[in-house]
A protein has these predicted regions:
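Structural recognition of alpha->loop->beta junctions
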Residues: 286-302
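Serine-esterase "nucleophile elbow" of acetyl-processing enzymes
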Residues: 41-109, 113-114
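Short, amphipathic alpha-helical "lid/cap" segments that border enzyme active or binding sites
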Residues: 94, 98, 226, 230, ...
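Histidine-centered active-site loop/cap adjacent to the catalytic His
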Residues: 24, 320-345
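Extracytoplasmic/secreted envelope proteins and their assembly/folding machinery
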Residues: 72, 76, 98-102, 230-233, ...
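Short, solvent-exposed loop/turn segments at secondary-structure junctions
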Residues: 64-66, 90-92, 118-122, 253-258, ...
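Serine-dependent acyl-ester chemistry module
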Residues: 120-291, 310
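N-terminal secretory targeting modules
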Residues: 1-57, 107-111
């Protein structure tokens, strides 16, 4: 009898949690509450958000774009004749951009819409893999749930922020000597090292060693994910009406496409490349597919900074050594290049 009551209670708890998640999923996807409003107000000064008669340039993207020190933040400071609205959110992809688009377009009515894509993990965001041999059970269960309930990823994002704030507060409470040591330990090194590379990237390539190559070359199981990506991107770009708005898709390349040494380095992290020479292509399948999909959309333009980043990298590094993101020099170069490509100066 006791066992039966326990099982019944457990079932009721699971049903309650499941129902709560379904309700949260509906609220999240429909954005009945603007769940990314905090980022909008963090990355944009009040005078930028408020209408002032200037045309608006709306930028949506992931961690390459989010933040005041990104190329979008730099454009905010340099393009005096435009309201540059940075609506990017770290860890998001085209699915999340599609969720937040109705709010952003209704609020800002952009004359230009820039969507930043990243070839390195945009298809990963469409479908998280499961790999029970190289990835922990907890991670596999999380990815399985996140594939079907997108609010799970959002909740994880918010919980991670809470954890980072708590860690930051604890460091501030340390003695000056210990705090200085903690800060020094967190600083990125100037040379690649497996032990220092971004842990998240190492988890991704262990779970799916062919992720980078399959994404860049649109092959294997990622071919289907790319088709979904294009479909969702078309839905997103439909908010940019041709009569009043022109759109740009900025495709950020992976560092291994800019610096060939990172083909070897990514291999040390667990990535697999069967055709490494294809990583040198300037017009690679991920990019070519975008051009083909939107060739009839006269107000949509694909911008490819790969050649510029390669040229800049010959002079100085444009990516961090142990992180897949652009460093401050890379962000500055991208901002200057974009201002020309978007015909803003």
């Amino acid at each position: 009898m006791l066992m039966r009551k326990t099982l019944l209670l457990a079932l009721l708890v699971l049903l309650s949690l499941g129902l709560a998640l379904l309700v949260l999923e509906w609220v999240y996807r429909a954005q009945l509450v603007d769940t990314y409003r905090p980022e909008l107000h963090t990355f944009n000064p009040g005078q930028v958000i408020a209408p002032d008669g200037k045309p608006a340039l709306l930028v949506i993207g992931d961690s390459f774009t989010a933040g005041r020190t990104s190329y979008a933040g730099i454009l905010q400071d340099t393009l005096q004749e435009w309201r540059v609205i940075n609506a990017a959110v770290s860890g998001t992809g085209v699915l999340q951009a599609l969720y937040m688009a109705p709010h952003r377009f209704a609020q800002f009515h952009p004359a230009i819409f820039l969507y930043q894509a990243y070839v390195g993990n945009d298809l990963f965001d469409i479908r998280y893999p499961t790999n029970w041999r190289t990835t922990s059970p907890g991670r596999n269960i999380y990815w399985f749930l996140a594939n079907h309930l997108r609010v799970v990823g959002y909740l994880n994002y918010r919980l991670r922020q809470v954890g980072e704030r708590l860690t930051s507060n604890q460091r501030q409470a340390l003695s000056p000597r210990v705090a200085t040591a903690a800060t020094a330990t967190a600083d990125p090194t100037t040379a690649f090292a497996v032990e220092h590379y971004d842990a998240r990237v190492k988890i991704y390539v262990r779970a799916e060693p062919s992720l980078l190559e399959d994404s860049i070359l649109v092959q294997g199981s990622r071919r289907h994910d790319y088709a979904i990506f294009l479909e969702k991107l078309a839905q997103l770009l439909a908010y940019c009406q041709q009569e009043v708005c022109r759109a740009y898709i900025l495709v950020i390349p992976h560092i291994c496409q800019v610096d060939e040494a990172y083909l070897t380095y990514m291999g040390q992290l667990g990535a697999r490349f069967t055709t490494p020479a294809a990583m040198r292509l300037s017009e690679y399948p991920f990019l070519v597919g975008l051009r083909a999909r939107f060739t009839s959309w006269s107000h949509v333009h694909i911008v490819n900074p790969l050649a510029m980043l390669r040229e800049m990298h010959r002079q100085q590094a444009v990516y961090y050594a142990n992180d897949e993101h652009l460093n401050p020099g890379g962000q500055q170069a991208l901002a200057a290049w974009l201002a020309q490509q978007l015909r803003l100066q």
